Amino acid sequence: MPSATGTKRVRGVSIFRPFVFGSEAQPFDPATKPSNVSSDHTHQWRVYVRGVNGEDISYWIKKVQFKLHETYVQNVRTVEHPPYEVTETGWGEFEIQIKIYFVPESMEKPQTLWHSLKLHPYGPDAEGKKERREVVVSQNYEEVVFNEPVEQFYDYLTGGSGTQQMQKGKSGKNAKQAQQQRGGRTAEIPFNETPENPYSRTAENKELDRLAEANKTVEQMIKDEKERLIAREKRLAELRASEGVPAQPLKKSFSGRIPVHSQQRMAGTVGPPDS
């Protein structure tokens, strides 16, 4: 039976879109603090959802809902047009629920994220940043993946050239090049980072290199520890032999299996949090 209009999916295709969510906060200068701000509010802050390097994300996001602390008036704020952000003042840090609604053509369910609002500097030179009243930025890079999107949404994501390319049999690198030549939308992040945007392919490659080096270090540590263990066992065997102590049978290595009675005791303690 043919799919209903607008619900036919592009099989075997996954498309991702990167974005950034987070917050910026800055302490008030007592000399210039606005008079209409509550006396106990020490900071002005902004929570947001943005495209990487200012990329437009409004073609796949319908609206963003921010759920603030219950002490705020109308603590659930919905923003239907970019910039997707909420600006407020306050004195405390708390968790903010961010709910992203996709355009109706996507036929996708909303995605929920959580962000911890940071008001105070952290990391190197935290005290210096506090004295200088610098902006505290706390943000995360995220990617949303659309698996087998409906055709209409696929066209939205690719700038209108997606299904035409699929019909012509283009795939992989050729399809991507054709899309870029037609001016289609892409999910490519910038090659180099800037002061405003730390996310880039260069930074990504540096992070991959760092992880590779860390993996080598861990592997070497494991190798060294195994060699030390073998040497200790050999020395222990020599001491036992010199004292005439019978050699003990080798212990079986841990198989990774949990006894049935242990599984029963653990039941109910592992799993997703209560909804």
From Swiss-Prot:
Region described as Disordered: spans on this chain: 161-207, 239-275
Keyword Lipid biosynthesis part of the UniProt annotation: no
Residue ranges occupied by any YEATS domain in the UniProt entry: 9-160
GO CC, alphabetical: chromosome, telomeric region; cytoplasm; NuA4 histone acetyltransferase complex; nucleus; Swr1 complex
Keywords: Activator, Chromatin regulator, Coiled coil, Cytoplasm, DNA damage, DNA repair, Nucleus, Transcription, Transcription regulation
Gene3D superfamilies in the cross-refs: YEATS domain
One example GO MF annotation: histone binding
Function: Component of the SWR1 complex which mediates the ATP-dependent exchange of histone H2A for the H2A variant HZT1 leading to transcriptional regulation of selected genes by chromatin remodeling. Component of the NuA4 histone acetyltransferase complex which is involved in transcriptional activation of selected genes principally by acetylation of nucleosomal histones H4 and H2A. The NuA4 complex is also involved in DNA repair. Yaf9 may also be required for viability in conditions in which the structural integrity of the spindle is compromised.
Subunit organization: Component of the SWR1 chromatin-remodeling complex and of the NuA4 histone acetyltransferase complex.
Record text about domains: The coiled-coil domain is required for assembly into the NuA4 complex.
Protein name: Protein AF-9 homolog
Organism: Emericella nidulans (strain FGSC A4 / ATCC 38163 / CBS 112.46 / NRRL 194 / M139)
